[in-house]
Amino acid sequence: MTTHVGPQTTLLHQTGQISALIAGEAVQTCEASSCQMSGTPFQQWTYVTEGRYTNARTHPSDEDRRRQTTVSNPRYLAQEPPRFLLPTAQNNAPTMSQSATYSTLPVQGFPEQNRVLDNRSDPKYGPLPATTGSLAQYSIQRPSTSRNMENAGSSSSYYDAPSCSRGSVGSIGRMNDLDSQYSGSTTAFPSPVHSDSSPIYPAIAPISGYQQQLPIHQRHTTSSMPSGFENLLHHHSTSPSPPPRCASSSSRYRLFIRQQPLAARACGAGDRDRRPVDPPPIIQLLLTEFNPNSEKDRSILQDPRFTVGCLLYPVRNPSYLPGSGSGAGSSDTNTNSNDKSRHESMSSYSQLGINLEDSHATGQSTPLLSGKAFVSPFFVDEEPDPNTAPAHPSSTDDSTYDASPRTVTHRFRNRPLPKPPACFFIFSDLSVRTAGLYRLQFRLMNWGSIEDTGQSMPILAEVWSEPFRVCAAKDFPGMRDSSLLTLRLKELGFVELKTRGQGMGKGRRVGIGSSKVSSRARVE
C-alpha cells in the first residue's frame, strides 16, 4: 500500500521547524537580558568536588585556579608526602614527575588535586581520547629489590604490608583527614614503602636483617609480649648462687631405741593385711655434746631431711640371747660400716645370729617386711617421758657409752628431771609375713648430704633391735597395752599411733596426766 503525502502535511512540518527556531532565539534573548540587568557576570557552570571534575568548556581564571588549590593546612601541604601508586607492568620503578597542567584526564579512580583540563574533552559528556597522559602529578621513587621491596603485579607489598600513615589510593578525602589530624604532630609514622631519602620519614624503615642479628631468644618477642616478660621467660641471673649448706659431721649422731619390738602376728600375702609389730618401734636421735640452749643444736634436730630406714633380718642362731652381743640397745659407733671388708661384715652379723646368705635368698622370693619402712623425724619441744629418756653422749665417755633405761633412771634419781627437746622416728606400720625370729636394723640417713656434697648418701648411724618373735595367728597372745611414751606422743600430734588399754576404746581420749594408764605403763 502506498501512502501519499499531500502539500498540506509538508507545509505543517516546515511551520513547526520555524516555530522551534523562534522559541530558541527567545530563550537566548531572555538569558542575555537577565545577565545585563544583574550587572554581574554569569559564571559558567562547573562541577568541582575536591578537584575531581571541572567544566572543560572554558578555561577558569587565575583567581578560580588559586581558590581551588587553596586548602586548610598549607604548612603541611608544603611537605606533603607523595601519593603512592602501583607500578605498571611495563615500568616497575616510576620516576618523580611534576607538571602544571594536563591535556587529558587520568583514568577514573586516581584523581589528583590542582588539575586543569583541556577544552578538547569533557569528562562528563565527551569520550576520553585514545591516548592519555601521565597517571598522576606525583609518583614515588620506589626502592629496588635489593631493599626487600618486591613488586610482582597484583601481589605487591603495598597491599600486604599495613601502615598507619598510608591512606587509600582512591580516596583523597581520607588523606586530607589524616593530614589535618597529624598536621601539628612531629611523630613519624613508619611505612615500608617509603624510600630512605624521604624528607618526612628519615631512616624509619625496618632495617633488613635486623631479626637475624638478634639472639634467638629475643626474636619476635618485642611486639607480641608485654614488657618485662622477657626477663621472666629468659632469666639470666647475674647474682652469685647461694652457698651450699655445710655438711654435717656424722660423728655426732647416735640412734637409741626408746621402745623395743616384742612380738608380732604374721600377716597374709596381700598388701591390705596389716598386723603391726607390737609395740611399735620408736627411735630417738641423740647428739654428742648436745646443748639444749644452742640454736644450732636445736636446728640439727629439726632438720626435715633426716630419715631412718628399717631392714628385717631373720635370726638363724637360736642360742643367741638378748644382751649377749654388744650394741643390742645402743647405736654402732663405727659409722663407716660401708668401708669394711666382706669378711668383717660376715663375722659381725654372725655374732648377732644372722646369716646374710639366708636372709638374701629369702628376700629374693617374697619380701618379708611390709608397710612403711622409711619414716621422717617427729620433733617435740619437750621430752614426753623424762623417766625413760636417755642422756645425750659426751665425747669423753664415747667408748663406754651405755644409754640403757636402767642407767638413765639412776642418773636422774637425785636431781630434777630435765625436759630437753627431742627428735623421734616412729614405725607405726611394720608387718612381717612369715613366722620366725627376727631382728630389725635401723639406719640414719640425710637426704641433704647429696645436695651438699654431690656424693652418695652415707649412713650416719645405725642400731640393732633385740630379737622378737613373729607368731602364727593361732599362737599369737594378743596386743599389749600402750606405753606412756606412746600415749604422750599421740597427744603431741602423732595421730598414726594406735593406743590400747583399759578404757581406751574408740571415741575416748586419755590425757597425759590421766589415771587410766595401765599399770605396765607406770612400771616402765
Curated annotation (Swiss-Prot):
Biological function: Velvet-domain-containing protein that acts as a positive regulator of sexual development. Positively regulates the production of the sexual fruiting bodies called cleistothecia.
This protein's record includes keyword Zinc: no
Organism this protein belongs to: Emericella nidulans (strain FGSC A4 / ATCC 38163 / CBS 112.46 / NRRL 194 / M139) (Aspergillus nidulans)
Stated induction or repression of this protein's expression: Specifically accumulates during the early phase of sexual development.
Record field: compositional bias (Polar residues): 131-153, 178-195, 393-402
Record-given protein name: Sexual development regulator velC
Gene3D superfamilies: Velvet domain (2.60.40.3960)
GO cellular component: nucleus
Keywords carried by this UniProt record: Nucleus, Sporulation, Transcription, Transcription regulation
Family that this chain belongs to: Belongs to the velvet family. VelC subfamily.
PANTHER family: SEXUAL DEVELOPMENT REGULATOR VELC, SPORE DEVELOPMENT REGULATOR VOSA
Reported phenotype of the disruption mutant: Leads to increased number of conidia and reduced production of cleistothecia. Increases expression of brlA, abaA, wetA and vosA genes that control sequential activation of asexual sporulation.
Transmembrane portions of the chain: none
Gene Ontology biological process terms from the UniProt entry: regulation of asexual sporulation resulting in formation of a cellular spore; regulation of sexual sporulation resulting in formation of a cellular spore; sporulation resulting in formation of a cellular spore; trehalose biosynthetic process
Keyword Transcription regulation: yes
Domain Velvet: 248-500
Compartment(s): Nucleus
InterPro entries: Velvet, Velvet_dom, Velvet_dom_sf
Quaternary context: Interacts with vosA.
Main subcellular location: nucleus
Disordered: annotated segments: 114-195, 322-349, 380-413, 503-524
